[in-house]
Every structure is written in structure tokens, then in C-alpha cells.
Regions:
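Enzymes that bind and transform nitrogen-containing heteroaromatic metabolites
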Residues: 3-4, 8-50, 66, 106, ...
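Acidic, glycine-enriched active-site microenvironments
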Residues: 12, 27, 52-53, 59-60, ...
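Short, flexible helix/strand-to-coil boundary loops that buttress conserved ligand/catalytic motifs
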Residues: 126, 161, 191
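Short capping loops/turns at secondary-structure boundaries
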Residues: 130, 134, 150-153, 168-172, ...
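Proteins enriched for Cys/Gly/acidic motifs involved in redox and nucleic-acid/cofactor modification
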Residues: 45-49, 74, 138, 152-180
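A residue-level detector for well-ordered beta-strand positions
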Residues: 55-56, 179
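Zn2+-dependent cytidine deaminase-like catalytic core
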Residues: 57-156, 243, 269, 274-276, ...
Length: 391
């Protein structure tokens, strides 16, 4: 399953079955790389602004080291796997979900570490488009005499780090819009009743989605109406709660809101216009909230491209949007939604209910945002469909 359809990455890693018949047995290579990808997924939501990388080291058909990028982006997956492998890494094959880095940062280059450990062969799923790497890691490995192969499970590896690549390419995070609606696309009755449209398994999946995103965004209207916490409340996963982001151009959310009151426990950022009340701004800062100034659009509202760029500048690579119909419409209309995670419940609310996405003002079908379905899954009595925006 995909990252979104599968929710939180599986924590049990399957070991490649059987011994390799040769140094480059395709079946064994595939199983080993899939294990590396599963490890990479563990880092999602915790390693930003870095990519999530998994590494499996195999010597004579036996896994001798596993690693994945640790919270905060350090140590890297290769470093962790080499540490666990120790001397057994000499003469081994390393399966890495993304090209090993070759630049100095807070830690030495992973390419150099693989060379120094005596690894004989490196299988890489995907080359790293980061200008600091950009095939230089592969070149360095080959120059040292290591056998290097690329492209195995490249599509899966690309999806894992789609947020990292989006930030590199566009300067903003990958945006996933999560909707939970009736069959006719409503999120509440005409009087605002919305609890609960989906069942408990679907709501658990929504919390799992939060755990694999760097940040979660809602509008001020959602905060004023529902006073949400926006945390991951699955047992044992509270520490994976994402940064809470509130779009609040005039700083209308009160100090009593749970997002504000708990800002020192879970990071909370408020996106506001520079013209917002300075006294309210200071009160939020005193509560531990980070206030991010963004540019206005032509109508005096939040310019969402500017807002997402501001999040990208702060390192956010994966953003989950759970706001109401106005926020969903604004982002979709601006062509800023990259993925849709749509939960449909088997009930009807009717045309007078509140729609999941407010009006676009479209006049022609050719102007409609279009998406490609990636997966569909039954969760309890509900249906989760993942879509990708067509480029």
C-alpha cells in the first residue's frame, strides 16, 4: 500500500527470504530494497527538512545491519545501518532508498562512510536531485571501486520522498488535502452537525496520517467552531504529532483555544497578515506560538502560495490539510493540492448540507482541477481513496 492509503508505516520489517544465489540475484535484490523502503517510511513526519532514507546491509545472504533516518534528520539511514553492521559490513551489499549524500553537514558524507566500511556493492533506488548531491554520491562510490546500481523500486522511493522533492523543486511542501464526507460530499448537516460521519477505524487512520506528516493545517474557522487539538492520539504515537498550522489572517483565534493553550507542548504556528493586531501577536508569542507573516492576495486574504513558501522556508516538506470547505477550495483553486485523501462514509446528508469544498466559481469544465486515482481501500464501513493531482 502507499504511504497515504496505508497510514502509519509498518513497524515490522520483513527480512529478505533465502540466500542470494549470486552477488546480484534480482529477486533477493528486490526483497532487500523493499525492506529498505519500509525502513525509510519510519522516518516520515519526523526527519524534515531532510529526506527519509532506509538502508539494509546484507553480507552472504544475511542482513547484518538496518537503519533509517532518525528524528531531526540525523543520523542518516546509512550511518545507522553501518553502526549496527560493524565489521560485517566489509564486503557486503548496501541497499539504500536514496543516493548516499556526499557533502559535509552535521555528519560526514554517507558515501564516504560506505567506502570506509569496506562495502563492496551499493544498490540505490533513486538518485538525489538535491544540488549538493545530484549523482556526485554515486560518482564517488564508483571512483572508489564499488559496484553501484540504480533504479530498483525508483517509483516507490520517489513517492516516499515526494515531499522532500517538492520542497526542492517548488520551495513548498507537498500538500495532501484530507476530506471525510458523506457519499454526496458533505462534511456536516445544514446546522453544522458532523460527529461522526466516518467510523472509528477511519478516524484512527486519520490520526495515522497525521503521524507521517510534518505539519497539519486548518483555518481559523475550524478552530473557532471545533476547538481541535490536531494531535496524533493513537496509543504510543503522541510524540509524532505534527506542527499545528492555523491560517488566521487577523489573529481572531482566542488565547483560550486548545491549540494556543498547548502550544508549548506541541508546536503551533499561526499564518497571519502583517497588518494583524500587534497586541494579539504579542500575546500569541508569549504563549509559545510562532507567528508567521505572509503576503496578502489581491482581495486582502492570505496568499496561499506565499504561505506555503513560508512553510517550506521553515523546513516543512509534507503538509496535511484538514480545514473546512473554504480552505479546501482556496488551495484547490490555486492548484496547490498535490494529493487527495478522501474518506467516504456510506450515508447521505443532502444538498442543504455543508460541502467539503466551497465554490470555485468555475464556468467551464476545462477549468476543473483534475486528479488521478492512486488507490482505494475499505476501512471498516468507509472507503479511503487516494488521488494525485494531474500535472
Amino acid at each position: 500500500m502507499g504511504i497515504l492509503s496505508g497510514g502509519l508505516p509498518r513497524m515490522a520489517i520483513e527480512e529478505p527470504a533465502g540466500a542470494a544465489k549470486s552477488p546480484s540475484d534480482p529477486g533477493f535484490d528486490l526483497r532487500s530494497m523493499r525492506a529498505a523502503l519500509a525502513l525509510a517510511r519510519r522516518g516520515l513526519g519526523t526527519v524534515w527538512p531532510n529526506p527519509a532514507v532506509g538502508c539494509v546491509i546484507v553480507n552472504r545472504g544475511r542482513v547484518v545491519g538496518r537503519g533509517w533516518t532518525q528524528p531531526g534528520g540525523r543520523p542518516h539511514g546509512e550511518t545507522e545501518a553501518l553502526r549496527r553492521a560493524g565489521e560485517a559490513a566489509r564486503g557486503a551489499t548496501a541497499y539504500v532508498s536514496l543516493e548516499p549524500c556526499c557533502h559535509w553537514g552535521r555528519t560526514p558524507p554517507c558515501a564516504d562512510a560506505l567506502i570506509a566500511a569496506g562495502v563492496r556493492r551499493v544498490v540505490v533506488a533513486l538518485e538525489d536531485p538535491d544540488p549538493r548531491v545530484a549523482s556526485e554520491g554515486l560518482r564517488r562510490l564508483r571512483a572508489a571501486g564499488l559496484a553501484v546500481e540504480t533504479g530498483l523500486c525508483a517509483k516507490e522511493a520517489s513517492e516516499i520522498n515526494a515531499g522532500f522533492f517538492c520542497r526542492l523543486r517548488l520551495g513548498r511542501p507537498l500538500v495532501t488535502l484530507k476530506l471525510a464526507t458523506s457519499l454526496d460530499g458533505r462534511i456536516a448537516t445544514r446546522r453544522g452537525a458532523s460527529r461522526w460521519i466516518t467510523g472509528p477505524p477511519a478516524r484512527d487512520r486519520a490520526h495515522a496520517l497525521r503521524a507521517v506528516h510534518d505539519a497539519i493545517m486548518v483555518g481559523s474557522g475550524t478552530v473557532l467552531a471545533d476547538d481541535p487539538q490536531l494531535t496524533c492520539r493513537l496509543p504510543g504515537l503522541g510524540h509524532r504529532s505534527p506542527v499545528r498550522v492555523v491560517v488566521d489572517r487577523h489573529l481572531a483565534v482566542p488565547q483560550s483555544a486548545r491549540l494556543i493553550a498547548e502550544a508549548r507542548q506541541v508546536p503551533t504556528w499561526v499564518l497571519a497578515l502583517s497588518s494583524a493586531d500587534s497586541a494579539r501577536r504579542q500575546a500569541l508569542l508569549a504563549s509559545g506560538v510562532t507567528v508567521v507573516e505572509v503576503d496578502p492576495d489581491t482581495e486582502g486574504g492570505i496568499d496561499f502560495k506565499s504561505a506555503l513558501n513560508a512553510l517550506g522556508e521553515r523546513g516543512i516538506t509534507r503538509l496535511l490539510v484538514e480545514g473546512g470547505g473554504q480552505l479546501a477550495a482556496a488551495l484547490t483553486r490555486a492548484r496547490l493540492v498535490d494529493r487527495l485523501a478522501w474518506l467516504h462514509a456510506p450515508l447521505l446528508i443532502g444538498g442543504d448540507g455543508i460541502p467539503a469544498i466551497a465554490g470555485f466559481g468555475l464556468e467551464a469544465m476545462t477549468d476543473a482541477p483534475r486528479f488521478k486515482r492512486l488507490s482505494i481501500e475499505t476501512i471498516g464501513g468507509d472507503l479511503l481513496t487516494i488521488f494525485r493531482a494531474r500535472e
